[in-house]
Amino acid sequence: MNDRIAIEGHDGAFAAYIARPKTVLAPAVVVLQELFGVNADIRKHCDELAEQGYLALAPDLYWRQEPGVDLNVTSDGSILNSARHLATGFRASLV
């Protein structure tokens, strides 16, 4: 079963994509997004891990700047620049 969930953090709630295996008890992995957010590629990777018996969770790392980023992997300069801008903001939010 695949779903989006909300996780409460100390400074607010953020979304995550979760893919669950058929078994109730399973090892878990955290799948970190690339520049493009929790997009179709990341969700597919989580789904494949669930098919292999893992619970896979992909948190939305950009939630403080722009929740729900889902950019297509492309060579389009404007999308690539947006992704780089979000990644820079993410790094700044860690300090």
PLM regions: where:
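N-terminal cap/leader regions of alpha/beta-hydrolase-fold enzymes
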Residues: 1-95
